[in-house]
Amino acid sequence: SKIMQEFDLIYHRDIPDGSQIQNGKIMRTRVGDKFKYHVVLTVKQPKKKPLSVPKNTAIGIDIGFRRVSNSVQVATIIFSDDKKPPQDILAPQKMISAIEHVLELQGILDDAATELGKKIKPLLNETPLNEEHQKYRLWKALAKYPNYVTLSFETAYKAARYLQIEPDFIPEKAAQALLEWWSGHSRRYRELHNLRAKQLLNRKHFYRQIASELVSHKKLIVLEDINLTIFAEVKDKDNALSDKARAQRFLASPSEFRDAIINAAKRETVPIKNVPPQYTSKTCSACGIINKELGAEKEWTCSACGVVHDRDVNAAKNIAELGKQ
């Protein structure tokens, strides 16, 4: 066969002994102006017997995205049968700083694209494009945004790149403004995409390390049954999160951490259980009284028994106990 391309193959993880590779495909994803390739293999593994674990012990995990000093607290973990102190999972400060830089770059590009949209929208609407043009949808994305929606920097960048192929794609004044925007922000755009891809990969690796450590204890793992997809990482019409909370959500990505734990547990046949999330933070783990008046406070005192609770630790204890029931 003719050799079209040679490249190094880096294993995400080893193929288990006795497994059979059923098929494979090459996936290409764009990162800025470059492409990244992944070889994805579908592997059939031998069936493992479910792991037998003690029924009187559990690992309770309270997943969240609370800001702590220079980092973000991803979760609080407690071992119900051990004398170990509760463990807060904090994202590495270096990773958080890098992702915050990504958010800063994104904010700069967002603001610049918003100003660009104010300039070129009237010019584009004066000279509509033929609907049969191959880039009509791109032109429409530039020109037909409602007044309350700003121009995306992704759309602006794509249009600027296409202008270098077809300079008459849009009116001359609009094209000039778009190319000036591209000249001033193209390097920042590429930096954003490259850093984002790198840091998201670092975050995924960090979470998989934590998940592997958890399943190595070979104990029941208990999580709250929460649909974390409702906390979107980006703005959308169904998301009421503040900008600050949304940024912390992006930094921590609880759904990615949860998926890493579930995948590791399935791989090692460690049992995992979901419990109802209602009142896990508000229920006193000492006497069982529910503090319905509790807001977002980190610490609170039970009015019945006087025990002072750390909100996250208390939730993890209750989650573990619910899992053992």
Residue ranges and their predicted role:
Residues 1-32, 80-81, 251:
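Acidic carboxylate diad motif detector
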Residues 35-325:
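Positively charged, helix-rich recognition surfaces that bind polyanionic ligands
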